[in-house]
Amino acid sequence: MKTRKQDEELLLYSQGQLAFLASQRQRKKAVIWSRIILSIGFLVLWQKGFDFEWIDDFYFSSPRAIGILFLQDLQDMSLLRHIGMTLWESVVSFLLIVTFSLILATLFWFLPGLGHTFEPFLIVLNSLPKSALAPLIIVWLGTGPKTIILCGMSVGIFGCILNLYQVFIQTDPERLKLIETLGGNRLQAFTKVVFPGSLPTFLSIAKTNIGLALVGVIIGEFLAGRQGLGYLIIYGEQVFKLDLLIMSIVILCAIAMLLYWLLSLLERQIEHRMLGM
């Protein structure tokens, strides 16, 4: 039974284009199934390594043990609180990174002299090791969620500002001249040309920074957290509870994949709307 989308494609595309779209769908399905098979194969091989004693359980943990611990911790809701705290801190850090970066990059574009003045300082700050500012932030603000959120911001904000600013100033000058010729001002040039033209790159930068925000939050939880997955990792290392440590790392990987997938979905929706305009 044909779907509405398939009926629309029959009206809009030629046979060659339809064949190309079909091949792309098949390729996408093959990639998805390959990932699933590789993941299952890795887990099976990992577990068999413990079953046949190829891996020393004193230094590592098995998928079965991690799964049992995960279900046990879910029952008393303690794990969900830690996951929720890390997720909340990461999302807030990411939103603050994107918001402040967009504001400052826009300001630098409207005031080129200001942008040239601050650019070398941003480069220096972005070149610092990602965990270098965290101890200083803890001294200033103490421990707590606000400190961890600021640690999350410090990892990605300087690079995000620089990248956005570079994208803005690399806008095709001929298009800007066209706006000026038609009597448009600098604000209209930004809203009609610069920002819309930079939106795909902006979304790509955002996808990168969601991972950086998560890294910064985990660093903050290592040093100043009393809740969160970073705190669980440090606690598991201190008491040599490897099941807890590895489970926390696996959950972090799942959170990173989820956030990246959500941003990719948002990116596709925006691109479809732009193409339909």
Per-segment meaning from a language model:
Residues L128, F168-E174, L178-S198, Q238:
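Short helix-to-coil transition segments within interhelical loops
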Residues V139-W140, V215-L252, L275-M277:
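Glycine-rich helix-loop "coupling/hinge" segments at transmembrane-helix boundaries
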Residues M1-I37, W261-M277:
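Transmembrane alpha-helical segments of polytopic membrane transport and secretion proteins
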Residues R81-E89, S131, V139-C160, S198, ...:
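Loop-to-helix entry region at the N-terminal start of transmembrane alpha-helices
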Residues I103-I138, L162-I169, K177:
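Cytoplasmic-entry segments and transmembrane alpha-helices of multi-pass inner-membrane transporters
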Residues Q75-L107:
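Transmembrane alpha-helix signature in integral membrane proteins
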Residues L150-S154, L187-G220:
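Transmembrane alpha-helices
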Residues P112, I169, S204, I246-M277:
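C-terminal transmembrane helix and the adjacent membrane-cytosol boundary/short C-terminal tail
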